[in-house]
Amino acid sequence: MEQNKCALVTGSSRGVGKAAAIRLAENGYNIVINYARSKKAALETAEEIEKLGVKVLVVKANVGQPAKIKEMFQQIDETFGRLDVFVNNAASGVLRPVMELEETHWDWTMNINAKALLFCAQEAAKLMEKNGGGHIVSISSLGSIRYLENYTTVGVSKAALEALTRYLAVELSPKQIIVNAVSGGAIDTDALKHFPNREDLLEDARQNTPAGRMVEIKDMVDTVEFLVSSKADMIRGQTIIVDGGRSLLV
């Protein structure tokens, strides 16, 4: 019997990460759930996924720390011996005006949102190439290409993530590893609750999205599912914007 493929989704205890992990499990992947603080939510997600008949590994790791990344991938190798899909979803950030930002705010955000992709991708590639390749998909946001209030650290980190996606796509292609990103418009998740202007963002999305509705978690996950399929093999180094057309109206 063919061994189940394995997918790692960072920051997968809730929101888009949780939904992506569940979708991949529905497609038969064994799942690695990663969390930094939400242990209870991570275990609940694992229990939900196990009911789908696949194996689950839960790993606590702050992906902003390369040493923790190495430990996480060592656990993946020991448990599953392979990795086929890596969804780089974990994100954090300090939401303040430019003049109020401190070095610690910058470093925290860049480490988790940008540096993590590089060092996770290095470790993921080592496992993926043993089984003929794989897919890496990162989650970005529109703040990478347009101004959002108090979003400086996150926006810059997501711009770095998208640039790194292009470099990884070229350099990992010889290993048959396909790298892309998905950038979403405003989605009503737990993460958005940290925004002081949350209601303004949601109302803007409701009123000014050409598609006539807000982007939902399912829309993001549908795109991730497509990008890790063979149907998307000729899409490389791209950031697919899933915003219902909102970014077209400036």
Curated annotation (Swiss-Prot):
Pathway: Lipid metabolism; fatty acid biosynthesis. The active site is at 151 (proton acceptor), 158 (proton acceptor). Inhibited by triclosan. GO terms for biological process: fatty acid elongation. The keyword Repressor does not apply. Disruption phenotype: Cells lacking this gene exhibit a 250-fold decrease in the triclosan MIC. GO terms for molecular function: enoyl-[acyl-carrier-protein] reductase (NADH) activity; enoyl-[acyl-carrier-protein] reductase (NADPH) activity; NADP binding; oxidoreductase activity, acting on the CH-OH group of donors, NAD or NADP as acceptor. Gene3D superfamilies: NAD(P)-binding Rossmann-like Domain. Coiled coil: none annotated. Catalyzes the reduction of a carbon-carbon double bond in an enoyl moiety that is covalently linked to an acyl carrier protein (ACP). It confers resistance to triclosan. This is Enoyl-[acyl-carrier-protein] reductase [NADPH] FabL.
